[in-house]
């Protein structure tokens, strides 16, 4: 690389990743094959449209690449329809929402502070700007989704669309109950499985594909693919919907809202990376990987509990959990900064019914997907939790410096994919 400034910064980032314990639940490591595809000459090709129906010439090979990605996605998820063009999970959600409802219609989504996502109706996001939004959350006592309460809220606000899914909810979501609620109020159901897609395809979480009208996901996080999005559908893929005043099959409506509705040319180099990720996730080794992610995450959560920390909802069924720091003289923002200082990266996170602002937060979110990709086992994950607890409980700069040395020495033994 001739650009020394960029090259040096990339090398610094590589060293940072090598010497830090990555616990951000939305991050992971891709394989070398995926990185090679994303960095390939495919980035040169413009390919507006869909396979065999492009607005540019010279697309025969990229048609094959996108068709292969679609075929593999359908096989992996057990779907009848897949659109692999969305540049991100947020853009996948935008396109899916626009295919199902119209501006001004009502959306019922999970409260952001209870574990939802910006695109599920937040007032600062397109979903809350162009649509009327209502929210459900978790029970104050159990910190679990109360489906009876969701039904009550749905009957009160009569949404046109219900969104199920979360970015910081550590328990299994019952998608069938959400579909029952949606059917009760004649609403569409959109399931956002961005965080749990890997668990679903590996068989460790119930699937939304034949339950929801549409399912969206990112292709990174627990899928270990490149940064990107995907839209899927099962038995409802050809259901007739009213789109721009006309009846249209759902999959055709989605194709229209992705291109030309919300995007121009697809990122063919990223689609190639997605295709590789789908193939990798179809292997038995991927199921073993997800099983280990769940084991490692549970081990860490249980250690925090044994050390007197409160875990939101009492535990975890997936790849993440939230630690409530309210009993410490420490905000989530403080903890994030402190742990960054000892080479452990995670993020501050609001907890349900949080009294602190989102910029401070009362909790931290911990994910086990990335460390498992580096080969950490349950005992290693226990050691990671011990590092964190030591750092959070000490107020000694000398001790923090010692912890940092131990963290670097520990994590260097694990290769990055």
UniProtKB/Swiss-Prot annotation:
Cofactor dependency: pyridoxal 5'-phosphate
SUPFAM superfamilies: PLP-dependent transferases (SSF53383)
Binding site for (6S)-5,6,7,8-tetrahydrofolate: 112, 116-118, 247
Gene Ontology molecular function, alphabetical: glycine hydroxymethyltransferase activity; pyridoxal phosphate binding
Pathway: One-carbon metabolism; tetrahydrofolate interconversion; Amino-acid biosynthesis; glycine biosynthesis; glycine from L-serine: step 1/1
Location in the cell: Cytoplasm
Protein name: Serine hydroxymethyltransferase
Biological source species: Borrelia garinii subsp. bavariensis (strain ATCC BAA-2496 / DSM 23469 / PBi)
Taxonomic lineage from the root: Bacteria, Pseudomonadati, Spirochaetota, Spirochaetia, Spirochaetales
């Amino acid at each position: 690389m001739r650009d020394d400034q960029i090259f040096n910064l990339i090398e610094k980032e590589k060293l940072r990743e090598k010497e830090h314990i990555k616990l951000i639940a939305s991050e992971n490591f891709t394989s070398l094959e995926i990185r090679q595809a994303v960095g390939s000459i495919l980035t040169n090709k413009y390919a507006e449209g869909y396979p065999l129906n492009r607005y540019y010439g010279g697309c025969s090979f990229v048609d094959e690449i996108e068709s292969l990605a679609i075929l593999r996605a359908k096989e992996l998820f057990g779907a009848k329809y897949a659109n692999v063009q969305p540049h991100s999970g947020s853009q996948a959600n935008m396109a899916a929402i626009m295919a199902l409802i119209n501006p001004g219609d009502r959306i019922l989504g999970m409260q952001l502070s209870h574990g939802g996502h910006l695109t599920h109706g937040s007032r600062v996001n397109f979903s809350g700007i162009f649509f009327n939004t209502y929210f459900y959350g978790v029970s104050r006592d159990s910190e679990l989704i109360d489906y009876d309460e969701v039904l009550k809220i749905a009957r009160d606000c009569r949404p046109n669309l219900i969104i199920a899914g979360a970015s910081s909810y550590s328990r299994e979501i019952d998608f069938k109950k959400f579909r029952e609620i949606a059917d009760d109020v004649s609403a569409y159901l959109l399931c956002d499985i961005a965080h749990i897609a890997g668990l679903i395809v590996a068989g460790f979480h119930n699937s939304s594909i034949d339950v929801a009208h549409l399912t969206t996901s990112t292709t990174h996080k627990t899928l270990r693919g490149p940064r990107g999005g995907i839209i899927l559908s099962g038995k409802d893929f050809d259901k007739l919907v009213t789109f721009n005043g006309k009846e249209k099959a759902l999959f055709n409506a989605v194709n229209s809202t992705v291109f030309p509705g919300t995007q121009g040319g697809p990122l063919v180099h990223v689609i190639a990376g997605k295709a590789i990720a789908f193939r990798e996730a179809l292997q038995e080794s991927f199921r073993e990987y997800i099983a280990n992610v769940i084991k490692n995450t549970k081990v860490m959560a249980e250690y925090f509990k044994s050390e007197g920390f409160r875990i939101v909802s009492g535990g975890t069924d997936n790849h993440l959990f939230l630690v409530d720091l309210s009993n410490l003289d420490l905000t989530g923002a403080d903890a994030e900064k402190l742990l960054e200082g000892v080479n452990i990266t995670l993020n501050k996170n609001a907890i349900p019914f949080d009294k602190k602002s989102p910029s401070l937060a009362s909790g931290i979110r911990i994910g086990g997907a990335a460390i498992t990709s580096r080969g950490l086992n349950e005992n290693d994950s226990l050691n990671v939790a011990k590092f964190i607890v030591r750092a959070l409980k000490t107020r000694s700069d000398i001790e923090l410096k010692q912890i940092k040395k131990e963290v670097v020495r520990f994590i260097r033994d694990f290769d990055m994919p």
